[in-house]
A protein has these predicted regions:
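Catalytic cores and adjacent binding grooves of peptidoglycan-active enzymes
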Residues: 79-129
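Extended, low-complexity, intrinsically disordered C-terminal regulatory tails
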Residues: 34-78
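Active-site acidic/histidine clusters and adjacent loop/turn architecture
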Residues: 1-49
Length: 129
């Protein structure tokens, strides 16, 4: 699976990160997160929305965030400790087109069962115990 088949880097990072690093921003993500979101997108067969700033929308901090982003900058200014998986490239907030949160959870469970069954089948086929 290739994440670039489903997402543009602008969708996954804040505008500050994109403006400074461009396509190099892909390297800031944990590969497991990219693989996970790619599998979810592929298995559900529906578009996923993270950030929309690049197309004039108001979603700006649902992917990789930086110290300049309002959410992080405000907490820093107030001397609040802020450690987030969004800063480390290991979390995304997103919507799935045409699905409610409950429908997504049900779909995610089906994906999980698919991979558990595939894992068990591979384990049995290879003779592992």
């Amino acid at each position: 699976m290739n994440i670039k088949n489903y997402f543009n880097i602008k969708e996954l990072v804040c505008k500050h990160v994109y403006n400074k690093f461009g396509e190099m921003a892909w390297t800031f993500f944990d590969p497991r997160l990219l693989e996970t979101i790619c599998v979810i997108r592929e298995k559900l067969g529906k578009p996923i929305t993270v950030n929309t700033w690049h197309s004039g929308g108001g979603l700006t901090q649902r992917g990789l965030r930086c110290n300049v982003c309002q959410l992080v900058a405000e907490k820093t200014r107030l001397e609040k400790v802020y450690v987030s998986a969004h800063l480390q490239g290991t979390a995304l907030d997103f919507d799935v087109k045409g699905m409610t949160a409950l429908e997504f959870v049900i779909g995610l469970r089906q994906i999980r069962y698919f991979f558990l069954i595939r894992y068990a089948w591979n384990k049995m086929s290879l003779g592992y115990t």
